[in-house]
C-alpha cells in the first residue's frame, strides 16, 4: 500500500476496474429487489457546473448505498439535447447545432465519468437522435388520432423583425431580446395537449405521493388551480348593444354578486371589438393591450388600465344596468374573457374603480366592518355575512352560494361550475433545433398524421440557423411531400415540439433504450418503473414534473406502463452558492470578479471583512453569497477541483457541507478539510496494513477499554444507517465517521486484539464512506485484505451486543448546576442512583445545611437535586 494518498492514481485505477468489470451494467433480475435511482438529465451546455456535480453526487450516493443493501440498482444517464441555447451558440459561432451539441456531450460525458458515477452507460439516451424522437412522434400521432392532441389558434409574442415567435422571457420591456423590435401579439395555429382532461387526476393523485416534498405538491396544486365557482350571465342591454345575448363570466365569489358595479372584458372579447367600431381612441387602447405581455405574472403586476365603452349589460338578479369596460387585466383565455367587478371585495377591481371613479358597494360584513374606506384593506376580501343584498342578507358564504345559484338557475342565467387555472399545453415552436411535429397538411384531407412506417420525420442536422424565423420553413426539400391519404402534393409541418416533451418520458425509455418495436418494452418498463428516487432542482417543481406526470398517465392509457405515477420519491437538492465580489463600473453597472481572483481578509470569527483583487491589490465590494452563475462570475469549475483534489474530496465536501435539500455554500477551506480527512484515513490504514493484517477479533475476550472503542464503532454504524437510510442526512453520517476516526487514531495497537479491533474499525469506516468516496474505499477495501470489490460488499450491520454498556456515567446537578459525576452499573435501580448521587463527596458540600425538596433522575443521563 502506497504511503501517500494519491487521488489521481487511486481514482484512475478504480474507474478502470469498474469499466473492465462492467460493474454498473444492469439487467432485469426477477425475484431481486429493484431500485431505480434517477437524477434529472442535463442539457449539454458545454461543461458541467457545480449544480450538476451536486445533483449527480447525491444520486450516486443513494444508488451505491441501495446496492450495498443488496438491491438490483438502475442508475442511467442521458442528454436533454434539443433547445434554444444550441441555436444561439450556432448563430454566434457559425456552427450547426447538431455538431455543437454532440461535441458538448462528448466532453461532459468525460467529466461525469471523472466523478466516478455508478452509471450504466449502455442505457444512455440522447433526445436529439432520431432513434429517440421517432417514438415521441409515434406517440404524437396516436394521441392526435385520439383527439388528445388538437390544433387551434393561440396567442403568441411575434417578433416582426426576426419573423419568429418569442417565449415570454425573451420579451424584454416589450421588445425582442435579439432584434430590439416592438413585439406584437399574434394568433397562429398551434398544437395543444389536452392536459386539462387530466387536471382532476393530476390533482388527486398528488395524494399518492407521500415521498414528495409538501412544497412541490402545493406548487402543483396551485398551478392546476381547481376552484369551485359560478358561471353568471349578464343579459345584453339591447338599446346599447343592438342585439340579444348574454355576457358570460366565471366567479369564485358569487356571494358578492349583489355588489357588482361594472363588468370588464378582455381586449380580444367580441364586445370590445364591437365597441371599438367608430371609436379610434378605444381601438388604439385595444391594440396597446394586445401588444402587451401574454405572461400571467406580468398581468398581475402591471398597471391596471381600462377604457369605458358605451355598452351596458343588465344585472342578472336586479336588472340594474352596468357599464362595460375594456381592461388590460382581464385574460381572454381564463374563464370567458370577462369579469364581474365587485370593487368593495376584490383588490384589483377596487384599484380600478378608484382610478376611474366607478361606484363601490359593500355587500359582505367583514372584520373591518360594513363600510369600505378609500384605501384597500386585506379584510375587505374576507368571507362573511351578506349585507345590502336584498333577500340574501344574513347568509354566510356557503348559504349565499346555494341561494344565489338557485336564483340564477330559476332565471336560466347561471349555474355552479368547476374551473381550473391549468391551460392546455401548447407545444408548437417555430424553432429549428427540436423534434419535428409529424403532421402533413393536405389541401383536401386536412391535417394528416405521418404513418408509422414513414417515421421518424428526421430533422436535417447540417443546418446553421440565422435567427430569422424557422429554417425548416425555408427548406422545400424538408416540407414538400405528398399526402399519405390521397397522394396529392402536400406540405409537411415545419414547427417543432416544445423541448419539455422529450424530458416528459425519458425516464421510461431508460428501461429499454434500444427497443425498436415501441416507445418502451412494457415488460422492462414495468419491471423498473416507477422511479424509486428522483433528484433535481426545485425550479422544475411545476412544468417538468407536471408534464412528466401527465405523460406517464398518457403512457398508462396507451397500455405501455401500469403504474399511475412516474416518481415514487422526489428529492429537490438545494442550490450551490458562493461569495460574490464586484466593483461599480463607470457606466453604473457592476463588474464581477471570480472568488479565485480575490484575496480576502477575515475577522476572528472567520467572517469576511475585506477583499482585494489579486492583480492590482485594490479593494473590491463584497456582494454576499449568491447562487453560482455566469452573470455574477462566482462559479467554481468542477474540473479544476477534481484535478487539484480528486473526485472523492469534491464528493465528500459536497455531501458533508450541508443536507442535500439545503443550499450548499462553497468554501475552499471546506474542500481542504475534506482532503485532509481522506489523507488521515489513508494514513491510519497504511500504518495498520504495513504491520501485516491481524487475525480474527475475539469479541468475548475484550477488556473494558476495548469495549469502549468497539461501542464507538457500532454506535457510528447505527446512527449513520439511520441518517442515510431514513433521512438522506449524509452530512451527519459523515460526522459519525469522523467521530470514529478520532477514536481509532488514539486506540492502542499493542496487542493482536488491539489490531483486530482497529481492522474492524477501518473496515466500518471504509464501508460507511463507500457510497460517498467510492475510489478511496475501493483501494482501502483491497488493502484491508478483501478479495471482492467494495461495490459488492454489504452495508455494515450493527452488533447490538457491542452497544450494551456495563456501566454508565451520570452527571449530578444541585439546583440545575453541575456539581459532580457518579459511575453506576447500567442496570442500577433509581434508588441506587439517587443514593450514590446524594453521597457524592462534592455534592455533599453543596447540599450541606439545605433541605432536599425533590430528586429528579433522568435514566442514563443525570440526577438533579432540588434543595433550599
From Swiss-Prot:
Chain sites annotated for binding ATP: 630
SUPFAM superfamilies: Anticodon-binding domain of a subclass of class I aminoacyl-tRNA synthetases, Nucleotidylyl transferase, ValRS/IleRS/LeuRS editing domain
Subcellular location: Cytoplasm
Single Gene Ontology MF annotation: leucine-tRNA ligase activity
Pfam families recorded: Anticodon_1, tRNA-synt_1, tRNA-synt_1_2, tRNA-synt_1g
Superkingdom classification of source: Bacteria
UniProt keyword annotation of Nucleotide-binding present: yes
Keywords, alphabetical: Aminoacyl-tRNA synthetase, ATP-binding, Cytoplasm, Ligase, Nucleotide-binding, Protein biosynthesis
Family listed: Belongs to the class-I aminoacyl-tRNA synthetase family.
Name of the protein in question: Leucine--tRNA ligase
Species of the source: Pseudomonas putida (strain ATCC 700007 / DSM 6899 / JCM 31910 / BCRC 17059 / LMG 24140 / F1)
Phylogenetic lineage: Bacteria, Pseudomonadati, Pseudomonadota, Gammaproteobacteria, Pseudomonadales
Amino acid at each position: 500500500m502506497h504511503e501517500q494518498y494519491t487521488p489521481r492514481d487511486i481514482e484512475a485505477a478504480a474507474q478502470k476496474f469498474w469499466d473492465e468489470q462492467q460493474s454498473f451494467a444492469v439487467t432485469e433480475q426477477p425475484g431481486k429487489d429493484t431500485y431505480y435511482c434517477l437524477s434529472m438529465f442535463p442539457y449539454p451546455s458545454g461543461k458541467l457546473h457545480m449544480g450538476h456535480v451536486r445533483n449527480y453526487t447525491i444520486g450516486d450516493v443513494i444508488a451505491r448505498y441501495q446496492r450495498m443493501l443488496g438491491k438490483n440498482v438502475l442508475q442511467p444517464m442521458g442528454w436533454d439535447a434539443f433547445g434554444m441555447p444550441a441555436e444561439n451558440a450556432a448563430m454566434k459561432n457559425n456552427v450547426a447545432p447538431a455538431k455543437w451539441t454532440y461535441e458538448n456531450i462528448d466532453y461532459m460525458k468525460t467529466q461525469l465519468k471523472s466523478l466516478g458515477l455508478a452509471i450504466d452507460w449502455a442505457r444512455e439516451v440522447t433526445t436529439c437522435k432520431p432513434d429517440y424522437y421517432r417514438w415521441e412522434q409515434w406517440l404524437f400521432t396516436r394521441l392526435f388520432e385520439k383527439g388528445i392532441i388538437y390544433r387551434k389558434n393561440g396567442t403568441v409574442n411575434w417578433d416582426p423583425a426576426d419573423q419568429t415567435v418569442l417565449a415570454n422571457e425573451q420579451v424584454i420591456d416589450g421588445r425582442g431580446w435579439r432584434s430590439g423590435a416592438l413585439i406584437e401579439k399574434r394568433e397562429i395555429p398551434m398544437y395543444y395537449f389536452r392536459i386539462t382532461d387530466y387536471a382532476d387526476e393530476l390533482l388527486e393523485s398528488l395524494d399518492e405521493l407521500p415521498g414528495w416534498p409538501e412544497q412541490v405538491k402545493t406548487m402543483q396544486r396551485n398551478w392546476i388551480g381547481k376552484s369551485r365557482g359560478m358561471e353568471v350571465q349578464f343579459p345584453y342591454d339591447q338599446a346599447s348593444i343592438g342585439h340579444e345575448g348574454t355576457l358570460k363570466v366565471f366567479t369564485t365569489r358569487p356571494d358578492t354578486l349583489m355588489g357588482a358595479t361594472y363588468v370588464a372584458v378582455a381586449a380580444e372579447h367580441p364586445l370590445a371589438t364591437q365597441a371599438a367600431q367608430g371609436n379610434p381612441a378605444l381601438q388604439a387602447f385595444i391594440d396597446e393591450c394586445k401588444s402587451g405581455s401574454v405572461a400571467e405574472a406580468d398581468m398581475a403586476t402591471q398597471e391596471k388600465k381600462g377604457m369605458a365603452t358605451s355598452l351596458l349589460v343588465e344585472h342578472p338578479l336586479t336588472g340594474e344596468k352596468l357599464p362595460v369596460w375594456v381592461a388590460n387585466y382581464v385574460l381572454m383565455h381564463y374563464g370567458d374573457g370577462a369579469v364581474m367587478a365587485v370593487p368593495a371585495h376584490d383588490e384589483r377591481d377596487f384599484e380600478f374603480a378608484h382610478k376611474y371613479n366607478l361606484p363601490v358597494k359593500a355587500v359582505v360584513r367583514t372584520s373591518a366592518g360594513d363600510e369600505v374606506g378609500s384605501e384597500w384593506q386585506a379584510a375587505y376580501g374576507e368571507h362573511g355575512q351578506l349585507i345590502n343584498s336584498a333577500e340574501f342578507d344574513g347568509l354566510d358564504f356557503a348559504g349565499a352560494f346555494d341561494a344565489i345559484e338557485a336564483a340564477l338557475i330559476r332565471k336560466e342565467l347561471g349555474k355552479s361550475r368547476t374551473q381550473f387555472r391549468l391551460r392546455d399545453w401548447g407545444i408548437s415552436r417555430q424553432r429549428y433545433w427540436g423534434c419535428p411535429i409529424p403532421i402533413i397538411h393536405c389541401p383536401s384531407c386536412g391535417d394528416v398524421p405521418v404513418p408509422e412506417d414513414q417515421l421518424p420525420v428526421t430533422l436535417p442536422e447540417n443546418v446553421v440557423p440565422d435567427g430569422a424565423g424557422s429554417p425548416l420553413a425555408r427548406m422545400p426539400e424538408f416540407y414538400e411531400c405528398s399526402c399519405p391519404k390521397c397522394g396529392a402534393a402536400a406540405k409537411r409541418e415545419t414547427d417543432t415540439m416544445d423541448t419539455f416533451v422529450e424530458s416528459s418520458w425519458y425516464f421510461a425509455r431508460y428501461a429499454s433504450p434500444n427497443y425498436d418495436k415501441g416507445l418502451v418494452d412494457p415488460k422492462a418498463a414495468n419491471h423498473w418503473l416507477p422511479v424509486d428516487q428522483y433528484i433535481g432542482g426545485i425550479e422544475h417543481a411545476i412544468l417538468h414534473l407536471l408534464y412528466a406526470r401527465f405523460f406517464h398517465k398518457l403512457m398508462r392509457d396507451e397500455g405501455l406502463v401500469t403504474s399511475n405515477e412516474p416518481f415514487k420519491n422526489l428529492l429537490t437538492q438545494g442550490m450551490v452558492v458562493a461569495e460574490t465580489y464586484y466593483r461599480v463600473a463607470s457606466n453604473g453597472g457592476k463588474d464581477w470578479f471570480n472568488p479565485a481572483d480575490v484575496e480576502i481578509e477575515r475577522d476572528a470569527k472567520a467572517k469576511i471583512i475585506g477583499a482585494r483583487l489579486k492583480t492590482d491589490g485594490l479593494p473590491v465590494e463584497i456582494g454576499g453569497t449568491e447562487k453560482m452563475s455566469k452573470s455574477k462570475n462566482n462559479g467554481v469549475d468542477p474540473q479544476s477541483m477534481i484535478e487539484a483534489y480528486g473526485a472523492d474530496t469534491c464528493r465528500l465536501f459536497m455531501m458533508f457541507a450541508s443536507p442535500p435539500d439545503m443550499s450548499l455554500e462553497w468554501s475552499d477551506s471546506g474542500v481542504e478539510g475534506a482532503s485532509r480527512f481522506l489523507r488521515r484515513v489513508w494514513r491510519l490504514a497504511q500504518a495498520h496494513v504495513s504491520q501485516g493484517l491481524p487475525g480474527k477479533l475475539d469479541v468475548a475476550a475484550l477488556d473494558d477499554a476495548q469495549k469502549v472503542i468497539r461501542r464507538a464503532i457500532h454506535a457510528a454504524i447505527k446512527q449513520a444507517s439511520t441518517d442515510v437510510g431514513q433521512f438522506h442526512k449524509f452530512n451527519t453520517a459523515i460526522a459519525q465517521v469522523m467521530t470514529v476516526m478520532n477514536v481509532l487514531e488514539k486506540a492502542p495497537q499493542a496487542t493482536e486484539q488491539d489490531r483486530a479491533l482497529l481492522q474492524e474499525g477501518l473496515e466500518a469506516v471504509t464501508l460507511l464512506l463507500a457510497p460517498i468516496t467510492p475510489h478511496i474505499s475501493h483501494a482501502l477495501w483491497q488493502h484491508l485484505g478483501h478479495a471482492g470489490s467494495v461495490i459488492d460488499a454489504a452495508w455494515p450491520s450493527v452488533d447490538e451486543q457491542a452497544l450494551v454498556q456495563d456501566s454508565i456515567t451520570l452527571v449530578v446537578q444541585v439546583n440545575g448546576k453541575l456539581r459532580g459525576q457518579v459511575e453506576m452499573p447500567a442496570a442500577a435501580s433509581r434508588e441506587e442512583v439517587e443514593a450514590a448521587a446524594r453521597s457524592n463527596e462534592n455534592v455533599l458540600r453543596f447540599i450541606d445545611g439545605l433541605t432536599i425538596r425533590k430528586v429528579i433522575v433522568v435514566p442514563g443521563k443525570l440526577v438533579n437535586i432540588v434543595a433550599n
